[in-house]
């Protein structure tokens, strides 16, 4: 059973290992998991994941792999060997790519990370999709990619909370991971399709990714406790 008692994932979106660990040391692994993204992972290499795991955190490795099937599957395998709790790939890589990742993880005898698909980035709106040749609403593209993810045997999806109700209705077995979460009164920053933590959970999200409202707070531990209180109502 997970040591974490909440659905919260704090994004360690920092340029250096020291800055990320400084924040992590102010957080309680029982109250949140942590997310390691491209900037931190690239600047710190794989050691950051092992260090966070040693501190008691479950780690979401948010690298959004997208490549040919074998290359992506090997990257997912490497992530699993690091001990990550969750890893993601772009659904737009296609059915064969996602299936290859699922099949590679199935070969493992030890713990398997949750394999999550990225649908449409929360910063993208219809005009952004049109710019890459997809003249559809984000919600339509999300549902298309979700169907592929379900067929490939993925564990869940990264999606906006605004898409969560439709996704839960269409694919109730998929776990939904929602970025762009902002507690009431927070700035939107560069996330467009957002909801508050309580709204996101009520909409069907299973895990909530929160970054700047906690990482840039004067007292991150206090900010985290406030979000926990908000979702527990």
Curated annotation (Swiss-Prot):
GO terms for biological process: 'de novo' pyrimidine nucleobase biosynthetic process; 'de novo' UMP biosynthetic process. It catalyses: orotidine 5'-phosphate + H(+) = UMP + CO2. It comes from Pseudomonas entomophila (strain L48). Pathway: Pyrimidine metabolism; UMP biosynthesis via de novo pathway; UMP from orotate: step 2/2. The keyword Lyase applies. Its EC number is 4.1.1.23. InterPro entries: Aldolase_TIM, OMPdecase, OMPdecase_AS, OMPdecase_bac, OMPdeCOase_dom, RibuloseP-bd_barrel. One of its GO terms (cellular component) is cytosol. Coiled coil: none annotated. NCBIfam families: PRK00230.1, pyrF. Pfam families: OMPdecase. HAMAP family: OMPdecase_type1_B. Catalyzes the decarboxylation of orotidine 5'-monophosphate (OMP) to uridine 5'-monophosphate (UMP). The active site is at residue 64. Belongs to the OMP decarboxylase family. Type 1 subfamily. It comes from the Bacteria. Substrate binds at residues 13, 35, 62-71, 122, 182, 191, 211-212. The keyword Lyase applies. One of its GO terms (molecular function) is orotidine-5'-phosphate decarboxylase activity. Homodimer. This is Orotidine 5'-phosphate decarboxylase.
């Amino acid at each position: 059973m997970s040591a974490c008692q909440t659905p919260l994932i704090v994004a360690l979106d920092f340029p250096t290992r020291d800055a990320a660990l400084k924040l992590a040391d102010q957080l309680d692994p029982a109250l949140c998991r942590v997310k390691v993204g491209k900037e931190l992972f690239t600047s710190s290499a794989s050691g950051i994941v092992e260090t966070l795991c040693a501190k008691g955190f479950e780690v979401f490795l948010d690298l959004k792999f997208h490549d040919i099937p074998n290359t992506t599957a090997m990257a997912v395998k490497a992530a699993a060997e690091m001990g990550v709790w969750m890893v993601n790939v772009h659904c737009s890589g296609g059915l064969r790519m996602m299936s290859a990742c699922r099949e590679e993880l199935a070969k493992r005898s030890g713990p398997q990370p949750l394999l999550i698909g990225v649908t449409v980035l929360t910063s993208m709106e219809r005009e952004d999709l049109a710019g890459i040749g997809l003249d559809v609403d984000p919600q339509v593209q999300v549902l298309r990619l979700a169907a592929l993810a379900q067929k490939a045997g993925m564990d869940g999806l990264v999606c906006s909370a605004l898409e969560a109700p439709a996704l839960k209705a269409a694919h109730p077995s998929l776990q939904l991971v929602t970025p762009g979460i902002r507690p009431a009164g927070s700035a939107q920053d560069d996330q467009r399709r957002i909801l508050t933590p309580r709204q996101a959970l009520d909409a069907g999200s299973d895990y909530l990714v929160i970054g700047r409202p906690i990482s840039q707070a004067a007292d991150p531990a206090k900010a985290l406790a406030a979000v926990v209180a908000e979702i527990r109502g």
